[in-house]
């Protein structure tokens, strides 16, 4: 067994993401029995000593039948109505399944916006930490009744990666109808063009030839979403296992199935992870070539002298993108000036500025490369 599978197998704190297709029948009906089977596997991991946080999709699917709908809705308002009804059924199903093992569950509804705002981010972290301290099983889901982009893209894949870092998890396990990563669609493979299974992703070269497909009609997250989320978590220092829900027992027991994603050697700090992946950008600073070198290669602070233009409306303490002259983002950071104030001093050397304004536009400690 590789060291990365071993890391998943022995992880003491685990986030398990359950996709919509793992909780529904082939016809799209929410299936409480499937959920109960997953809880049995999760309970086995918890009895072995691991702390588990669950990120559960399926609210919209769970609301289809109670509302008398024949299929998953396509318009936003009906999706949100289905989510409103389905969320009740979903959390009740989780609660009933864990009650068999005398465990209490707590529901945490989030949107990407909640994670992006530092105050809400910290509040969510405290809530999850307290639930775990009280030995309750946290069931996290996106708040689909108010979310917009989140309800259409990701199927909780990205949220699970953010939650994994939020709670300081040692591993992230993604369970759905996808049994791992392939360099082609296995459903369309032929003897002449087989789809090669990729057991481990440890370097960019391991992804050569990988084609990211679309999700099923029941969920919204396809291979592209799962791959992006797995790489996000791995880049932050969290090992990831992508496996089929049908193999949940083995995935949670010994990590012997699916594709494992190797984490970066050093775990990213919570603050830098938030800046890079969670925070919403309030604007952008365009840097000259010298400033890009100073920030990226020399890891120095960004001074007003190296900024050529400022866009957006931001205040000191907001997160902004740092862009090269060709427009691509090279870093993100917490800006020390309001937009109007910074715009008035860009391109000027520090000694030209009043004493009270001789500070970096973005300090090196508040920068993260992208």
From Swiss-Prot:
Subcellular location per the Swiss-Prot or TrEMBL entry: Cytoplasm
Record pathway: Amino-acid biosynthesis; L-proline biosynthesis; L-glutamate 5-semialdehyde from L-glutamate: step 1/2
Protein name as annotated: Glutamate 5-kinase
GO BP: L-proline biosynthetic process
Sites where the protein binds ATP: 17, 176-177, 220-226
Binding site for substrate: 57, 144, 156
Catalytic activity: L-glutamate + ATP = L-glutamyl 5-phosphate + ADP
CDD domains: AAK_G5K_ProB, PUA_G5K
Organism: Mycolicibacterium smegmatis (strain ATCC 700084 / mc(2)155)
Family membership noted in the UniProt record: Belongs to the glutamate 5-kinase family.
């Amino acid at each position: 067994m590789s060291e990365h599978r071993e890391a998943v197998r022995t992880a003491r704190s685990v986030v398990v993401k359950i996709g919509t297709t793992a909780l529904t029948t082939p016809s799209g009906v929410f299936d409480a029995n499937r959920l109960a089977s997953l809880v049995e596997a999760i309970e086995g991991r918890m009895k072995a000593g691991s702390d588990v946080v669950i990120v559960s999709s399926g609210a919209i699917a769970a609301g289809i039948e109670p509302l008398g709908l024949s299929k998953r809705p396509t318009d936003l308002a009906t999706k949100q109505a289905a989510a409103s009804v389905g969320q009740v059924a979903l959390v009740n199903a989780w609660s009933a399944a864990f009650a068999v093992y005398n465990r209490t569950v707590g529901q945490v509804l989030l949107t990407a916006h909640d994670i992006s705002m530092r105050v809400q981010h910290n509040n969510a972290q405290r809530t999850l930490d307290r639930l775990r301290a009280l030995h309750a099983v946290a069931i996290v889901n996106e708040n689909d009744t108010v979310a917009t982009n989140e309800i259409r893209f990701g199927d909780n894949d990205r949220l699970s990666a953010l939650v994994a870092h939020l709670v300081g998890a040692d591993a992230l396990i993604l369970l759905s109808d996808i049994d791992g990563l392939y360099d082609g669609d296995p459903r369309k493979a032929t003897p002449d063009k087989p789809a090669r299974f990729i057991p481990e992703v440890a370097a960019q070269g391991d992804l050569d030839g990988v084609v990211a497909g679309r999700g099923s009609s029941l969920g919204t997250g396809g291979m592209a979403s799962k791959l992006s989320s797995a790489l996000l978590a791995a880049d932050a220092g969290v090992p990831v296992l992508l496996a089929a829900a049908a193999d949940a027992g083995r995935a949670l027991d010994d990590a012997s199935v699916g594709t494992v994603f190797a984490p970066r050697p050093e775990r990213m700090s919570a603050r830098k992870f938030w800046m890079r992946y969670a925070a919403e950008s309030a604007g952008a600073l365009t840097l000259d070539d010298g400033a890009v070198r100073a920030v990226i290669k020399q890891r120095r602070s960004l001074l007003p002298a190296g900024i050529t233009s400022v866009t957006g409306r931001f205040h000191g303490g907001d997160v902004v993108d740092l862009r090269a002259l060709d427009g691509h983002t090279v870093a993100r950071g917490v800006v020390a000036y309001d937009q109007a104030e910074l715009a008035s001093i860009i391109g000027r050397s520090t000694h030209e500025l009043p004493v009270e304004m001789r500070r970096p536009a973005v300090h090196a400690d508040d920068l993260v490369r992208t």
